[in-house]
Amino acid sequence: EYPIASYRNQFGTVFQDFQLFSETVAENIMVKRPLSGQQRKDAETALQKADMLERINDLPNKMDTLVGREFAPDGAVFSGGETQKLAIARAIAKDAPVLILDEPSSALDPIAENKMFETIFDSFRDKTVIYILHRLSSATFADRIYLLENGQIAEQGTHSELIAQNGKYADMFHKQAEKYIS
């Protein structure tokens, strides 16, 4: 049996309902306080990779700005897309061997979404990344795709293989693609 803390440390997660804490930006990224000098550098690196460092550096106290207005009237409030980028920064900073993402780009525009997936796959190149999504254009980044139907694997393969099979995945992909071109 493994200690539960060791088990949990193996996973980084980004869920749709990601929550920010009423702490500083840096503490939100590292989920720890007080922060050492190295942890502050790690938070800054993660924010850079998540395309949020410029936004954070525009805040009055940069990474030391409190998030939310519960305890500070001048606390930072972030949009849905910015919150998702902060969630990605937290996952990058954790640097776990397995990353699980549930609709990590639902609040991002297509350009930001593409950049986010490039960042994720660059940062987690030698690790396992599992992501759940409905916007299939993002699935093209995956080494392996599993289409689930009624809790069962209905189709599996690479994007190219699934398109060639001309099954449900291909049908859904083409229907979504039509929305972008029409």
Placement of each model-derived feature along the sequence:
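ABC ATPase nucleotide-binding domain helical subdomain, centered on the C-loop/LSGGQ "ABC signature"
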Residues: R8, A26-P73, F117-E118, D126, ...
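ABC-fold ATPase nucleotide-binding domain signature/coupling loops
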Residues: L53-L86, D95, K179-S182
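C-terminal portion of ABC ATPase nucleotide-binding domains
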Residues: N61-K62, E118, T140-S182
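Hydrophobic anchor residue at the start of the ABC signature
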Residues: I88, M116, I132
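A residue-level structural signal marking coil residues immediately N-terminal to beta-strands
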Residues: A96-P97, K127
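Catalytic Walker B motif of ABC-type/P-loop ATPase nucleotide-binding domains
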Residues: L99-E103
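Helical segment within the ABC ATPase nucleotide-binding domain
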Residues: E113-R125, S137
